[in-house]
Amino acid sequence: MIKSPFKWTTTWNGIILSDDNLILPNTWTITFDYNAIDDDLFRRDIAMQRLEYMFEEKFETSIWTNFSNPWVEILYEKMNTFIITLPAEPYDSLIASTALLKAQSITNGVFDFHSCSITSNLGYKVTNVIDIEEAVESNDSMYNEKFSDGPWYVRPDAGFTDILTTQDGDVTLIKDSKDWGDYNLNWDYYDDENIDSLEKYKHNNQKERWIPLIIKGGASDNED
């Protein structure tokens, strides 16, 4: 088993919509084991910000449910709550597996994820451990022909759900597939050799995280 030099843990709250149409509030804690394989500190920092965006902006307070749940289309049309669809009922193991695959996809070439572990209040705080090979095999076994480029959790974009709707008898797949540049979290800006390091730092420091590129003295106005 690969020994991971880094661990990152985060917690979020959300709601499960079960196949039995039960609405269940839940709190999850997940820990990722990974290695940093890119020496560029800007890219590492952006990778961490992408992970935080995934949990803080998309996973937090969202509804988790089966892609084929008939309530998905109704909730999508009537509510503003973000709905995250999965290929089966949203058990902890499947949530961990899809989160691990998405983490690998959105940090590809910068971080290399080996495994993750997840606990939740509804799961009696029992720890589920998923390695990356198991997650990949699970995704392959649940192949859906509706996804020509794969479901949200294997795409590298800033999308975090797929919604199936029916209008006038036509079935439409709505993909949440935004560009990371919309959130100043794209790699290209930092790969541009025409932009000097100070400008890259200022751009990145709009929401500074994880790796201090400059040691600051005195008071700081940063919220982090």
Language-model features: where?
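Short, surface-exposed ligand- or partner-binding patches at beta-edge/loop junctions that are enriched
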Residues: 106-120
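Histidine-centered catalytic/metal-coordination loop motif
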Residues: 17-101, 218-224
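N-terminal intrinsically disordered, cationic/polar leader segments
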Residues: 3-19, 33
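Short acidic-hydrophobic catalytic motif
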Residues: 184
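Hydrophobic residues positioned within well-ordered beta-strands of beta-sheet architectures
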Residues: 6-8, 26-32, 114
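Short, low-complexity, polybasic intrinsically disordered segments
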Residues: 117-157
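Short hydrophobic short-linear motifs embedded
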Residues: 155, 163-167, 174-177, 192-221
